[in-house]
């Protein structure tokens, strides 16, 4: 499992505040940050393929398949088990100091790998910031999303 940050390089806390405040204006349309750039599926698949080729150069030829929302995989659960982060109360994977502003990609392989100890963690505690800031109030409860409320 890998992640790729999608915040603009020039993003600051002021930029994030402006974006969030823009969501509070119902008469103003807003396009999600992740949809403003190149198609992340293509970008990540290309990067994962390069990574697979690099691995083959280092350790020998093995089979690989790059997946970015293109296979019936539970990506958040796999990422959590791999130690990338934890599932937040907003149902997304969260990373310490990065939040949820990243894409997930999977590199499947037939290469034998050592298993490691599960590093599942949850650092949300009593925090409900992501639920409180949801502009459409789409969360019925922690970890429970009413997807019908996601679109204005």
Ranges and model annotations:
Residues 1-123:
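Auxiliary alpha/beta "docking" domains used to position bulky ligands
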Residues 129-152:
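Iron-sulfur cluster-binding cysteine motifs and their immediate structural context
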